[in-house]
Amino acid sequence: PLVSGQARTGISDTMRPGDISSLAQSSERAFRVTFGGSMPEYRDRYWRGLILDTLDDGTWRQSGYDPYQAPGRVNVDGGVGELKPGEYDVLMEPTDQRWAFALEGSVAVSNNVIKKTDNLFRFRRPADSAVRYRLALEGGDEPAAEALLPGDARRYLQLPSEGNPRARALADELRRSSDEIPAGDSSVGDIEVIRTLLTRFREQPYFYTLRPPKMPDDGIDSLLFDEKRGFCAHYAGATTFVLRSAGIPARVVVGYQGGEGGAGNEYLIVRQY
């Protein structure tokens, strides 16, 4: 176990970055991927795993998580043959969780993984041993964004009633500035809010560090206005908070980026760091 205030890189179904003052990089393998065709470009290798959409007392969690699991042990092999172009096999290390990782625009091929309505993939049972599953990338143009259901929109705007007042004021300022732009489509104002916030992170002296100061109280305010140092969880949580405060539905998507080639680029290894 790690001492208080420390953590290791990897995936969890909760996120509370304000309590972490040291993030140790783990080189343990998360999963290995073999492609039936060419390997995607690095920018296209984002492996989505789960969504955190509820903030309570500084902790991001999943809401509406499906607790159902089939009896018995996880099916460790989907029982499919040779890889076809566009398909890819994932050999995932044990996690004792039901989530599976996939690229954007994937569909299930093997019978041991299912696609949920939120475009995430799940096993029917927790992965208590290494699991191999197969997915395929859908061809054609990038799918158009779907309109949010009313329940999803409410959930992706949820915030505690109090806390982080400076971040809320920043969101109000960004919204007022965007409302000054003449446009017939309110989404243009939303895009301007997002663009301005991301420009703030790029142009002001914000830094990425694995050794941030602890920010337990109003941690998003501390990150945005005082410390300006953190790792990916800090910035993801702060961005989601500000966007929700500005009236823009947002959520934290958890996963891995990239991967390194192995055996002459015959497969891809994604590690915990």
Regions found by a protein language model. Name each.
Residues 1-273:
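Helix-boundary/low-complexity linker signature
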